[in-house]
Amino acid sequence: GFAHVGMPGGIGAYKNDGTLKDNAKVIYVWADNAKAVTTDVVTNNKGGKTTGVGMQNIIYLYQKGYDTTPMAFRIIGTIKKENMDELGSSSEGLQIKGKGAFSDMPITIEGIGIDAAISGFGMLVRGTKGVELRNFSVQLCIDDCISLDTDNSNVWIHNMDFFYGNTGGDADQAKGDGTVDLKAGTTHVTMSY
């Protein structure tokens, strides 16, 4: 699909042949450890590392733009809003944001098993290149299930289930705003099932 245009090495943490990219990190996340998962992330131009604690905090550290190590977050079971260390976007939920427009963010968030889900929040993806979301459901999102908002490219969303969201402010938002929202310069996106 279009997500793979100009990406011969693959999308997210995976090569095009479906195997993990060299040196990829894999973090298993479930309700009881979403606030406590850890990994070291390069956070300055001298190679200095900071230990990220919690799923959102680890992604925040990637936003600095110094670490492009492929990262696979593997969701097991249902992770609810209250299980998260924090949410980067109060209007959407988990935030994956690049340092600037189309920043290389080789991150995959994937579900493991038939019950993998996030509940009570969605995801905001902004200013990224190479993000993959797959194999989990989004339930009771704040606004959109997935918002690709501003300057994203080469994003692959597949094998996902989207359910009703929270009631929005407009008359047509009784069961949430939307499922996947693409805005403002987002290009080369593949959504498939």
Task: Please state what every model-predicted region is.
Residues 35, 81-82:
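Flexible, glycine-rich phosphate/dinucleotide-binding loops
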